[in-house]
Amino acid sequence: MQERHTEQDYRALLIADTPIIDVRAPIEFEQGAMPAAINLPLMNNDERAAVGTCYKQQGSDAALALGHKLVAGEIRQQRMDAWRAACLQNPQGILCCARGGQRSHIVQSWLHAAGIDYPLVEGGYKALRQTAIQATIELAQKPIVLIGGCTGSGKTLLVQQQPNGVDLEGLARHRGSAFGRTLQPQLSQASFENLLAAEMLKTDARQNLRLWVLEDESRMIGSNHLPECLRERMTQAAIAVVEDPFEIRLERLNEEYFLRMHHDFTHAYGDEQGWQEYCEYLHHGLSAIKRRLGLQRYNELAARLDAALTTQLTTGSTDGHLAWLVPLLEEYYDPMYRYQLEKKAEKVVFRGEWAEVAEWVKAR
């Protein structure tokens, strides 16, 4: 059983999306995990807490004995069955605990006794986490081109289509605005950073990467924030601004926020509940900027949103949403973005419609 413990080994694990059987407790996994990890804990949260208390009060030997007592009999067999199945399903995988200590070694020895030799991560999650942090710091030093533009300019799609593009919003599972949530819950901050590091490592490994193409994001993307090392580099980066006609932007927003979100909600929840979730999603987005709109203007737009939803429900048409979307863009989102762009005008190196910016980026 060969353990992997060099920096290059850790990076190779992330680049290859090597399946990781993470045997830490669920609470630890939720706080931060690697992208390709599945959580099959040696101890659940309560068992881990009990063993931790025992360790503090009575020492390591007593804690180890308690752990073996808690994970015994049918409980141990159930967990063994899960580990065995995961090992057989992921023969190229690897075991991981917090620091490559007792938990992963215990599971490894139990599997060995059952006839399965499976490697473990020496240094555990902590070593992988440090590798992810260091990789982001290093890779962020490469030149960056940011794709800017008003809401609905197709910036995310443009980034996605570049071989050296990294979709920060996709990784964060959020589109960055008040209406930015998706049906996928956002990851913990550590898990988001790990996912970002893995994506940057994989993208860099696929080619002789000269520069990154990223969307011009603020520090926060929903509840996740960009690593400071990357954010600092982005503040110094050149910006290419997409300037598409207003009507084209409206078409994109209609497709993304009304047609697609309605489809996604009904697909996930069924027609009736999906419709309610979709309505709540739009109202929540508008409510999030109530103070900035002012109460009177918010109430006017909320009433128009209600009318648009009624029309959509009865006719299937999303055209009614223009009655609140157009003023929201003209009075709030567009002025806000233009103000932000003015503050970094010296960083703008190219302006053009979507296809022109895409061609310019391709030539870099």
Curated annotation (Swiss-Prot):
Sorted UniProt keywords: Selenium, Transferase
SUPFAM superfamilies reported for this sequence: Rhodanese/Cell cycle control phosphatase
Alphabetized GO MF terms: transferase activity, transferring alkyl or aryl (other than methyl) groups; tRNA 2-selenouridine synthase activity
Domain Rhodanese: 14-137
Reactions catalysed: 5-methylaminomethyl-2-thiouridine(34) in tRNA + selenophosphate + (2E)-geranyl diphosphate + H2O + H(+) = 5-methylaminomethyl-2-selenouridine(34) in tRNA + (2E)-thiogeraniol + phosphate + diphosphate; 5-methylaminomethyl-2-thiouridine(34) in tRNA + (2E)-geranyl diphosphate = 5-methylaminomethyl-S-(2E)-geranyl-thiouridine(34) in tRNA + diphosphate; 5-methylaminomethyl-S-(2E)-geranyl-thiouridine(34) in tRNA + selenophosphate + H(+) = 5-methylaminomethyl-2-(Se-phospho)selenouridine(34) in tRNA + (2E)-thiogeraniol; 5-methylaminomethyl-2-(Se-phospho)selenouridine(34) in tRNA + H2O = 5-methylaminomethyl-2-selenouridine(34) in tRNA + phosphate
InterPro entries: Rhodanese-like_dom, Rhodanese-like_dom_sf, SelU
UniProt key word Phosphoprotein: no
Family: Belongs to the SelU family.
EC number(s) recorded for this UniProt protein: 2.9.1.3
Gene giving rise to this polypeptide: selU
Keyword Transferase: yes
Entry-linked CDD domains: RHOD_YbbB
SMART domains (alphabetical): RHOD
Known function: Involved in the post-transcriptional modification of the uridine at the wobble position (U34) of tRNA(Lys), tRNA(Glu) and tRNA(Gln). Catalyzes the conversion of 2-thiouridine (S2U-RNA) to 2-selenouridine (Se2U-RNA). Acts in a two-step process involving geranylation of 2-thiouridine (S2U) to S-geranyl-2-thiouridine (geS2U) and subsequent selenation of the latter derivative to 2-selenouridine (Se2U) in the tRNA chain.
Family annotation (Gene3D superfamilies): Rhodanese-like domain
Species of origin: Shigella dysenteriae serotype 1 (strain Sd197)
Record-given protein name: tRNA 2-selenouridine synthase
Source superkingdom: Bacteria
Pfam families, per the entry: Rhodanese (PF00581)
Active site: C97 (s-selanylcysteine intermediate)
UniProt subunit comment: Monomer.
